C-alpha cells in the first residue's frame, strides 16, 4: 500500500535561543530537516512539510536541496498545535506517516517497520529506564489503551516505562474522521495530535505500539540536544567508514561530516576535521588537519595542515602549518609554513618553508601558476598574477613580481652589510 510522509516543521523552537529556524540548525554539516527528508525519500515519494514560523526561509532551503516536496502553511492563528498542523492537508494515500522536523536521527530502515504493522494507528514507543517527566503509554494485549500524563497517572501507571516517541502512522479515513473533532480545551489552547488516540480508541479503532530505539527518536529542542544528536550521528558516520576499511586513530577526536566520502585505503589521525563534499582517496591525513570541500588523492596531509574549499591535491605531501585554498597541486611537496591560494602547481615542484602566494590586491584574487620541477626557496613571495615555467630555481627570500621563463634562476635580495664591532658600540661594552 502506498503512503504519504508529513513532516511537522511549524514550531518556533524558542528553547534553541536562536534567530535561525530550529530545523535549519546543522548536524554533521547538514540542517536537521535535510537529514529527515533524505531518510523519508528512501521510503516515499509523497512528502509534505508543514511550515509556519519563518516558513519562507525553510521553504527556500528545502527547494534548493530537494525536488518534489510539497509545502502546507499551518493556520496557526485558528488551529495551533500538532493537531492543527494536519487540518488543511489533502491526503492522497491511504496511510500517513507523521514525523517531527526536530528528529534528525531517524533512519529509513526503522520507519519501514511502521508500514508493516496492520493497524489504524501505529504509535512509536520508547522504553525508558527513567521516564520521569513523560506521559506514559499504557499497553494491554499488544494494543495501546491510552496515554496518561505523569501528573494524572496513578501509582500503577507511574511504574510503566513506556513513553510516546512522537511519530505516528495513521490511516487516511481515521484522520479525516477525527481531525475536525479535535478541540483546544487545554491550558495551551492548542489542538493536539495525541488526542486522536483517545478518540480512535473510543470508536473501536486498533492502535498498535511499535518500540523504537531512543537514540533515533530523540528530539532536538536546545543547543544541548543538538550537541548530543551530533555525537550520535558522528558515531554512525565513523562506524560506517571504519567498516569500509578506513583507519581512525582515536576516532572520538575526529569530526567527519555527512557528505565526506572515502575511497581505497585511508588513514585519519587524531583531531582530524573533514567538512563538506570532501573526497579522500588512498591518503593519510595526519593529526589536527582540516580538509573542507576538497579532493585528496594518494597524498599525505599534515599534521596541522588546512586544506580549504575547491582544492585538488594529488600525489603530494602537504606538511605542518601549510594552508591550501582553491588550488590544484599534482606531485608537489610543501613541507611547512606556507600559504598556497588560487594556485596551480605541477609535479616535481618543491615549496620551501615560508612561501606565500600573494593572491589578493585588496580588490580581486589572481592566479599563480607554477610548472614542473620548480624549486621555490624559503621565504619566497609570489605576487599574483604570475607564471613560473618548468625547471626554475627561485632563491630563498625572493619576491617574484613577473613571469619566470623555463630553466631560469630568480633571485632578489638586498646585499648583506656587516658592521664590525657594532654590538659592543651599541650596548656600550668593551
From Swiss-Prot:
Acetyl-CoA binds at residues 353, 359-360, 378, 396, 413. InterPro entries: Bifunctional_GlmU, GlmU-like, GlmU_C_LbH, Hexapep, Hexapep_transf_CS, MobA-like_NTP_Trfase, Nucleotide-diphossugar_trans, Trimer_LpxA-like_sf. GO terms for biological process: cell morphogenesis; cell wall organization; lipid A biosynthetic process; peptidoglycan biosynthetic process; regulation of cell shape; UDP-N-acetylglucosamine biosynthetic process. Its main location: cytoplasm. One of its GO terms (molecular function) is magnesium ion binding. Pfam families: Hexapep (PF00132), NTP_transf_3 (PF12804). This is Bifunctional protein GlmU. The lineage of its organism: Bacteria, Pseudomonadati, Campylobacterota, Epsilonproteobacteria, Nautiliales. The gene is glmU.
